[in-house]
Amino acid sequence: MKAILALADGRVFTGKAFGARGEVTGEVVFNTSMTGYQEILTDPSYCGEIVTMTYPLIGNYGINPEDVESGRPHLSGFIVKEACPYPSNWRSTTTLDDYLKQNQIVGIQGIDTRALVRHIRDNGAQTGIISSIDLDPESLVEKARKAPSIVGRDLVKEVTCKEPYHWTEGPWDLSEGYQQQTGEPRYKVVAYDFGIKRNILRNLVAIGCDVTVVPATTPAQDVMAMNPDGVFLSNGPGDPEPIQYAQENIRQLLGKMPIFGICLGHQLLALALGGHTYKLKFGHRGGNQPVQRKAEGQVEITSQNHGFAVEGSSIDNTAVLTHINLNDNTIEGLEHCKLPAFSVQYHPEASPGPHDARYLFERFADLMEKNRQSQG
């Protein structure tokens, strides 16, 4: 069945429908990862986005019930050069096409993804539409232009949990799969769910944390009443500026206990400190972004997924910039000058991606231990 991708600037691509049939709008972005499409599909940070995979063949190892980062896909649509119809992997239980159909995700394949990615790179991420219903290019371009922008929207409320819950699952093991937490946890952590990935929670369990996940709107007073050793600020979708309630809660929690933020959590921490954020031209999405630790000069290859960044000069008086992106010199990490609070823009938990930065979870544990000892 024919399908069309149309961008708000008038560019049109014709291909074949796969996954669910229908019509969806979203910000068209690209991810440079060769693998990890299942984790990408289920990452809540992609809410409101139509994701293009730059690797030409996607779906060749199928879909399994374990490698998911949330309970369902959150992205608006999926674009690939070719979707593999016959996957081969010992863990696979279904095809990519069937998985998208089951979850009502509209996809398009067979377009020139190289041309699309170059267009986004040169002209910036923009609103687009995929349709297998309306096949009139002019009509679709007009719909794309009228679709809401991702800027200024609170997408966190669309992906956060409704009620608090306890997380006990640890990282995956080749012989045993995902293991439940054993032994007595060392630290009690409250994790704000702005769109949290499960592998972040697994890494918190791995360092000995008893993790309680709370909705994004949970008041700071309720968190403090839980008497945690630390607070974690999760990843999440879209523009951080409208998430005013989270910024205010973070301000109230600063100095009360150690705080660690990742991705959107990093941006929200910066905003809570009086900083500013801005929209990147086409964002960082992939598992091969080089980041330098400024103190040591050491380089990490990192997994990233964000379309906004922190303006470095806006937080000079309150925080130290700890990491920079070597591709474009954007801010990748910060640390409060006096209080036990730090964050990174990238994803140390990977999933998918490299594990160069998992030391950051241990650093969070060290801060909680020092804070506990200082309180006697």
Curated annotation (Swiss-Prot):
The active site annotation covers C263, H347, E349
Which EC number(s) does UniProt give? 6.3.5.5
Task: Show where the Glutamine amidotransferase type-1 domain sits.
Answer: 188-374
- KW Amino-acid biosynthesis (keyword) present: yes
Which family does the entry's similarity section mention? Belongs to the CarA family.
| One GO molecular-function entry | carbamoyl-phosphate synthase (glutamine-hydrolyzing) activity
Q: How does it assemble?
A: Composed of two chains; the small (or glutamine) chain promotes the hydrolysis of glutamine to ammonia, which is used by the large (or ammonia) chain to synthesize carbamoyl phosphate. Tetramer of heterodimers (alpha,beta)4.
Catalysis performed (reactions)? hydrogencarbonate + L-glutamine + 2 ATP + H2O = carbamoyl phosphate + L-glutamate + 2 ADP + phosphate + 2 H(+)
Q: Give UniProt keywords alphabetically.
A: Amino-acid biosynthesis, Arginine biosynthesis, ATP-binding, Glutamine amidotransferase, Ligase, Nucleotide-binding, Pyrimidine biosynthesis
Q: Which domain of life is it from?
A: Bacteria
InterPro entries found in the cross-reference section: Anth_synth/Amidotransfase, CarbamoylP_synth_ssu, CarbamoylP_synth_ssu_N, CarbP_synth_ssu_N_sf, Class_I_gatase-like, CPSase_GATase1, GATASE
Region annotation CPSase: residue ranges? 1-184
The name of this protein is Carbamoyl phosphate synthase small chain
- Name of the gene: carA
Biological processes per GO annotation? 'de novo' pyrimidine nucleobase biosynthetic process; 'de novo' UMP biosynthetic process; glutamine metabolic process; L-arginine biosynthetic process
List the CDD domains: GATase1_CPSase
Species for this entry:
Syntrophotalea carbinolica (strain DSM 2380 / NBRC 103641 / GraBd1)
